[in-house]
């Protein structure tokens, strides 16, 4: 019997950015349909608008009002259509409440489809946080990003962000907050929670005996308290508690040398304490900037939300407003995110 292909809901992201373009480019790869059944969620007019820009005017868009209507045929992009964009007010590369709300609503719809069991996984294109909150804050709402939206709409309290580039994986104790606040969030219970989430993610990816590394917060991992005490008071106790639960974990380790070992295959996942501690090493190996084209190329990283009752993966880059509408955006991160979603969905 042929293996069942998962249905993956792909949100369009902020339509003023690169999401619609890279979605078309990704789904132009016919082999994607060998692995998944892709369903785009958003305003179909935005996908139609970029077919030529993306270099694929031969492709077509099928608007559907239910998952059951989708046929998942290469060359035709199934879009769960939501009437979100006024074409007279739309402009590429501009922050707007209209596009921010469109991106937000497409994410919420994808979550609803996954929670209802109508799709097997979700995969998100980038949204612009300023645009989204420009739309939401007048209503008394605010979200820092995708992860917080997913946590709210799935009722999840224990979650974390994982970034992956091939065999390098990092999972964060904190992400979108000021660095001063990030230091305050380094607490034993949270560090232990993230160690466990990272270990579980590796198991779901088929790694039988995950090796987990934990970075220190301070220079030289605190140098035995000389440069800070968080390693002694919070991080080390969390590591000991994780070991007591049978997790193979090492640390706290100095982050300036840790990633060389991780890239060499010594560890399966690295727990980092704050946003840039994990994003910098992963994006250093996952991003390439083409100076001549003045554009990012070969963007291979993937963002995964851990701890949710549904699968959510994402591109590991922003909306690319400076490239929007020019046909120069790279779809590789989205292709990898779709594949990651399929891998995680197959384990559920």
Q: Which role does the model predict for each range below?
A:
Residues 1-144, 189-213, 217-273, 277-303, ...:
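Contiguous, glycine/small-aliphatic-enriched amphipathic segments in soluble metabolic enzymes
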Residues 91, 148-149, 164:
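Intrinsically disordered, low-complexity segments enriched in polar/charged residues with Gly/Pro
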Residues 74-77, 165-170:
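Beta-strand-turn-beta hairpins that frame and shape the catalytic cleft
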Residues 144-157, 179-201:
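Active-site glycine-rich loop that binds ribose-phosphate moieties when present
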Residues 152-168, 305-319:
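Short, flexible loop segments at boundaries between secondary-structure elements
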Residues 90-91, 176-179:
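Gly-rich Lys/Arg/Thr-decorated short loops/hinges at beta-loop-alpha junctions or inter-strand turns
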């Amino acid at each position: 019997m042929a293996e069942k292909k998962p249905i993956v809901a792909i949100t369009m992201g902020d339509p003023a950015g690169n999401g619609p373009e890279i979605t078309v480019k990704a789904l132009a790869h016919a082999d994607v349909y060998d692995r998944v059944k892709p369903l785009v969620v958003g305003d179909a007019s935005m996908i139609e608008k970029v077919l030529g820009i993306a270099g694929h005017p031969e492709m077509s868009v099928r608007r559907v009002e239910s998952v059951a209507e989708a046929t998942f045929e290469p060359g035709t992009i199934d879009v769960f259509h939501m009437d979100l964009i006024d074409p007279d007010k739309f402009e590429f590369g501009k922050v707007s409440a209209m596009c921010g709300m469109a991106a937000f609503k497409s994410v919420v719809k994808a979550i609803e489809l996954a929670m209802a069991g109508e799709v097997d996984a979700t995969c998100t294109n980038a949204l612009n946080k300023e645009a989204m909150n420009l739309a939401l804050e007048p209503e008394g709402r605010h979200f820092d990003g995708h992860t917080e939206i997913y946590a709210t709409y799935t009722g999840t309290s224990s979650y974390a962000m994982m970034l992956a580039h091939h065999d390098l994986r990092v999972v964060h104790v904190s992400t979108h907050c000021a660095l001063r606040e990030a230091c305050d969030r380094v607490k034993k219970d949270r560090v232990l929670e993230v160690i466990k989430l990272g270990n579980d993610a590796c198991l779901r990816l088929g790694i039988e005996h995950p090796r987990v590394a934990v970075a220190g917060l301070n220079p030289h991992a605190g140098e035995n308290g000389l440069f800070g005490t968080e390693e002694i008071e919070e991080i080390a106790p969390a590591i000991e508690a994780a070991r007591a639960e049978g997790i193979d974990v090492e640390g706290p380790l100095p982050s300036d040398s840790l990633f060389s070992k991780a890239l060499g295959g010594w560890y399966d996942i690295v727990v980092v304490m704050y946003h840039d501690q994990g994003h910098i090493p992963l994006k250093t190996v996952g991003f390439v900037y083409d100076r001549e084209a003045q554009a990012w190329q070969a963007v291979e990283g993937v963002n995964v939300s851990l701890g949710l009752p549904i699968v959510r993966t994402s591109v590991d880059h922003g909306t690319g407003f400076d490239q929007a509408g020019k046909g120069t955006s790279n779809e590789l991160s989205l292709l990898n995110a779709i594949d990651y979603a399929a891998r995680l969905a197959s384990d559920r």
